[in-house]
Amino acid sequence: DPLIGRPVTVFTGLAVFWAAAGYFLKLDGVVSASLMTGLLDPIPLVYRSVNFLLLPFADSSFHLTSSAQRHYEGAWLTASVFFAALFLNLAIPRFYCRFVCPLGALLGVLGRYALWRIGKKTAECSQCSLCDSRCEGACHPAGRIRIPECVLCMNCLYTCNDELIGYNTFRSASGEIVSPDLSRRGFVAAAVCGIAAIPMLRIDGRLGQNFDPALIRPPGSLPESEFLDRCIKCGQCARVCPTNVIQPDITRAGIEGLWTPALNMRTGSSGCQMNCTACSHICPTAAIRPISLEEKLGRGAFEKAGPIRIGTAFVDRSRCLPWAMDKPCIVCQENCPVSPKAIFVKESFATVRGGNLSRAKISGATVLLSDPVLQPDRLGTGDFYVMVEGGAVSARTRILSNSQNSILLASQVAPELNTSDLKKIELQVRLQTPQVDPERCTGCGICEHECPVSGLRAIRVSAEGESRQRKHSFLLKSA
């Protein structure tokens, strides 16, 4: 530059992009190292890609590991990271290892203390640059070799025709660069960002009272803050889950909890099975601690502590069929696996809309209607009754079957009752409205999975009452 007397380095095309991306990825690597364990680490990345992407894809056609198709949330994000790490190598060899991999960065820091290292035996060299052209880490073995960038591919040893490069215990004769290529200002900026990232992202209070009640962790999970510290997002727990209910979380736990395991009761074949502890025994970091079946069910030595609870089911009365629409349904109560059941029902009777049969006539066990208004056999389910009141008689009789203009009852209705004494004839439905006992509910989610209300279920599991964090309890504790 003629104004300041310094040489100008010109970047064009992809060089501009990769130069900028390199600084960004280095900074991101520092932040990720302190904030998101396993997010870009190579081993969890491979396991996560296999578990959430490759195996489900293989099962969709060949059923290699599962008889049923397995589904995982956020598969597009997993695929994006996996294929980006794979195909960016076509632009720059070993792109992931050189610019992204946090494990490679750690090895680079420790590499300066290695006993054995690549280097020149003598400084004299023909400068053919064959070693540089074959170097996988672009660490410039022909000159001052960048020790933190060397991946020990050994290509330079086999490429040098003069055999000037060796794997020795002494330093390279042409000199070494042992420090990372990061200025003091850049180091300070990266360190400040890394240190400030966690408290800034936790300002929303997700680990306190502002926790997401829809975030259900697998049984045996540690308290949330410790769970996030340990979980490496490998996806092994989701892979071994027999019902496919464990899913990689994308949004509920925030950026700290990206790809951590959470239960989605709507997916898979059922909820969390009572006799299964597979996820707790495969977790490599004990973010989900190993538990026995006795501990999960609260039996034997664990009877006093009770079963492990991952949440509590709540009935949404605005969507529940018996509560909101006067339609008989006890699916959640029937499927509750706890004994005695955590879901019980309260019986009541409600008059069906348009069920005033004041113009009907009773003949023995048959009710004759003046108009053909009924759908044949619709009332023969055992939940419909005819309520008759008149004089001193008040009787409710179950319906066996019906035609368009007649109803057959299970027994004769008050044969001594005169037709002139009838005050009310109504068509009623027996409703069994579900109730949840929070002292018995373990949050397994089978009721939510089996609920016939599609979309937003009428009964849903919430994290309140989970065993791993007593502060999430919604019940008053005795003094």
Question: Predicted segments — roles?
Answer:
Residues 1-479:
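Non-ligating segments of multi-cofactor redox enzymes
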